[in-house]
Structures are given as structure tokens and as C-alpha cells.
From Swiss-Prot:
One of its GO terms (cellular component) is cytoplasm. Phosphorylation at Ser-560 by atm and atr promotes its delocalization from the centrosome and impairs its ability to promote centrosome dependent spindle assembly. It comes from the Eukaryota. This is Centrosomal protein of 63 kDa-A. One of its GO terms (biological process) is spindle assembly. Pfam families: CEP63 (PF17045). Required for normal spindle assembly. Plays a key role in mother-centriole-dependent centriole duplication. Plays a role in DNA damage response. Following DNA damage, such as double-strand breaks (DSBs), is removed from centrosomes; this leads to the inactivation of spindle assembly and delay in mitotic progression. It comes from Xenopus laevis.
Amino acid sequence: MEALLQGLQRQDRMGALQDSCEAELQELMKQIDIMLDHKRSQWEAETETMKTRLELKEQELNCALDREERLNQEVRRLRQQLIQQEEETQNKTTQYEAQLSGFKEELNRLKKSYEKVQKKHLRSEMKAKAEEERSEVSRLTRRLEEFRQRSLDWEKQRLLYQQQLAGLEAQRKTLIEQTEMYQHQSHNRKQMLEQTSLVGRSELQNLSGQLHRANDSLCAKEEELETLKIQLRCAVEGQKRAEHETELSKQAVQALKEEKAELRATLQAHTEFLQGSRVQKHELLPEGYRGSEVLRENNSIRSVEERLQEMGQVGGETEVEAIRSKLSVSRMNEHRLQAEVTCLEDSVESVTSQCQLLAKELKGKEEYFHGVKEDHQKCLSENKKLKGQLSQAELTHKSVLDGMRKEISQLTQELHQRDIRMASSAGIDWERKIKAERQRAEREAAEHRMSLNALENLRQENCRLSELLQTQEPDVAQALVNLEQANQRLQRELLQTQEKLELIAQRRESEIQNAVDSISQELLNKQEQELRIMQERLKVYEQEMQTFRSQQDAASSGSSLESIFSEVWKEQATGSPISAASVDSAIEPVEDLASSLPVPPTSPANAVASRFLQEEEQRSHELLQRLNAHIEELKQESQRTVEHFTQAR
């Protein structure tokens, strides 16, 4: 009985422990559900971010292709404009050459007419005015000396002009050197771009390898998660079975407790009955003794009866009858007591057998509860292992995603820095070129002013000579007037050509400045538009993420543990290539973007940067070509003007 009571007490303690374990297990399952919901929302958010980034990179690629197409169209348009300008310059040069040839013919004609007039005048005056001719000859010789002196001065001016031409040639050489330097710089830039592109390709290859490895590791982790999910399902089912069995065991324990109470009551009744029977036995023992004495007396009475019968005594019959009645009563009491004793013995045997059966059942229940407790401990240990594995997998996944985010941020920062450096270097180059162009234009303007001053001096000298000739000879004066008119006409044409050259130079400078301003403005506008588009996309993405999170929270509140695991597995199965591709910009579809471009996808940032650098290099190369062509045109025009001045003089 004491062993039975101890077993029941142990069962009570086991039930309390089982209740506490069930509460802890339910709390643990709730925590696991919350953690899985949180991680699922994080994974969904990350997959959506990777998808949006992939779409953004594809749109950027399309924009870059459209930009390249527009640049090609602009290049074709500029080429057509260049061809038209070359045709116009050729037409102008032919016109100027025709005008110069006309001027030369007119000068030759005037010289011939002047010589004819002079010869005619000399012939007519030769005979009549010999002395005057002599004086005139002497005067003319003096004038010839003066003209020789002036010719020496003109020779000096010619030397000065030659020096100016040498200076212009030196300027041309310096400009050629500058162009070569620009070409060398562009070649160096091209090499640097090629090196950066090679480095970017190597980085892309490394990233693609890392992403492939990450994909393999993610696949392995997905398989591990599948096995863990199966194990967790088995553990949950085992836990449910254990809970059901614990409920059944509780019911059995409750029934056993009731049976125990009933058995205790029956035992108490049986013990009381045994005690009463023992008391009755003790009470009936003297009666038995008395019955035995009565039997002995009965025997003695029988013997007495026999004797009386023998003796024929009738007076003792009444006593014998009384003794017989007493004996019958004592026999009945003895039989009743024996029956009660046998009943009590049978009841005691049945109670002892029931107690043995209950002890065996309690022992079996204790063993069953011990097994259930061990299973519960195993389930708890398996749950802990699963939690550890899940936390480790989450940490590794989080570390991988953090690394990918860091790489993407570094690539974007490098792209922005490269854009800033390229824009600053391009602006500095343009400023230098514009400054050099302005200095050259100022030098040309100074040279033009010097030539104008020289022409003004020549005009004054011609006026003075014409006045002297008018005072002496009318024919010579008329010829000089004609020459002066021709000279004035040539000066007007020279001024017109100078004005045209200045207008052309101003127009070219304004075109260059407008082109620089328009290109810089276009670049700034494009960058601002791209930034606005990125900001709008980020806002839209944040709104979509908020709505998605709200929907996910509403959907996850009514989902069970098994549905959560299945959804997480599906999301991983669909989202793992994106997360792998997302730094591949971040994973495999992006890697298809870098090779097609694919990465964060094959680092789309490097592909866009390389294309942007190639476009900037093309633009700089085209601008250098245009500047070289403009410089060559200005040099040719300056040479033409110098030749025109020398021929006119």
C-alpha cells in the first residue's frame, strides 16, 4: 500500500512537471512562430528589393542604350554639319581666291597703264623739256632714293611680318603639341579606362564566382532547412502524440485515483469488517468453548440417556431436550461463524489480488510516464537543435546579404565618385580650352590691330605722296588717285574680311561655349532626372513594402506552423536566385545583366560605369577633333589674311 501511495504521488509530481513542460513548449512554439513570421517578412522584403533593383538596372540599361543611340544620331548630325561647314569654307576660299586674282589683275592693269602713261608723257616731253627732264630726273632720282628708303622700311615691315608669321608658326606648333598632348591624355585615359574595365571584369568574375558559391551554399542550406522542417514536423507530431498520450494518462490517473479512493474505502470497510470479525471471533471463542463443553455434555447426556433408557428413567427426558436445543443452537452459531470466517478470508484474498494488480498497473504507468518524459526531453533537445540551426542559417544568410549590400553600396559610391571626377575633369578641361581659345583670339585681335595700324600708316603716307604728286603733275596725280581708290577699295575689302573673320571667330567661340554649356547642362539635367527617378522609385518601393508588410502581417496572423514553413520554403525556392543574383547586384538575374548585364547582377554598376566612361571618352574625342578642326580653320584663315596683306602691299 505504501508503494502504491508513493507511485501515485510520483504520478502527481509527473503531471505537474508535464503541465509546466507543456506551457514552456507552447511558449517556445509561439516564439518560433513569431521568429519565422519575422524572418519570412524580411526574406520577402529582400526578395522584393532585389527584384526592384533588377528592374531598375534593366531600365538604366535601356536608358543607356537610348542615350547611346541619341549620341550616335548627334554624331551623325555633327558630321553632316562639319561637311557643310567644310563645303562653305571651300566656297568662301574659292571666292576669296577669285577676288584676289581679280585684285591682282587690276593692279597689273593699273601698273601697265601707269607705265604707258609715264612713257607717253616722257616721249612727249622729251624733246621740249630736256632740262626739265634732267631736273625731273634728278628729282625723280631723289624720289627714287626716298622710295628706296621706303622700300627698305617696307622690307623691315616685311621682316616684321615674317617674324609675326614665324610667331604664328610657333603658335601653330604649340597648338599641334597641345593637340598631341590632348591625344596623349585621351590615349592615357583610354588605357586607364581599359584597365578599370579589366579590373571591373575581374571583379565581376570574382563576384560571379562568389555568387555561384553562395548559390550552392544556399541550396545546401535549403536542403538542410527542408530536413529540419521534416524533423520539426515529426517533432510536432510526436509532441502532439505525447500530449494526447499525456491527456489519456491524466484521465487514467484520474480514474486510478478514483479507484484508489474506492479501494481505500473498501479496504477501510474490509479492515473494519475484519476487526469486527476478529472481535466477534474473540467473542465467539468462549461460546465455542461453551459449545464444546455442551458437546461434551451432550455426549455425556447421550450416555446418560442411554443409561436412562437402559434404566427406564423418564424424568430426565425434559432435561435432555433442553440440552439438545442448546446444542443445536451452538452448532448453528458455529456454522455461521465458520461461513463468515471463510467469507472474510475470500474477501481478504480478493483485496490482496486487487492490490497486487493495482501495484502492477501503477508500475507500468510509471514506466510509461518515464518513457514519455524521455521523449519530451528528446523533443525539447531536438527543438533546441532546430532553433540553433535556424538561427545559424539566418545569421549566415544575414551576413551574406550584408556583404552583398556593402558591395553594392561601395560600387555605387565608386560610380558616383567616378562621375564626379569625370565631370570635374571635363569641366576643367573645357575651361582650359576655352581660356586658351580666348587668349588665342585676343592675340589674333592684337595682331589684326597692329596690321590695321600699319595700314593706317601706309594710307597716310599714300595721302602725303598723292598730295605731292598732285602739286607736280596732273596725270601722275590722276594715276595716284586711281591707285588710292583701288587701295581704299582693297582696304574696305580687307576690313570686310576682317569683320567676317571676327564674326566667324565670335560665332565659333559662341558655338563652342554654347556646345559646352549645352553638354554640361544636359549632363546635369540627366543626372538630376536619374536622381529624381531613383527617388520616386524608392518612394514607390517603400509604399509597396509597407502595403506588402501589412498584407503579410494580416495573412501570417491566421497561418499555422506548417503553412509558415511551406511558405518560407517556397519563398526561398523562388527568392534564392534573386538574393544570389541581387549582389550578382546582388545575384544571378543581375549576373545575366552584367553579361547581359547580370549581377547587382553581374555588378551592373561596373557595366554602366564602363559604358558611361566610354561615352565620355567618345565625347571628349569628338570635341577634341572639333577643336582641332576649328584651330586648323583659324590657322588657315590667318595665313590667308597674312598672304592677302603681303600681296596687297
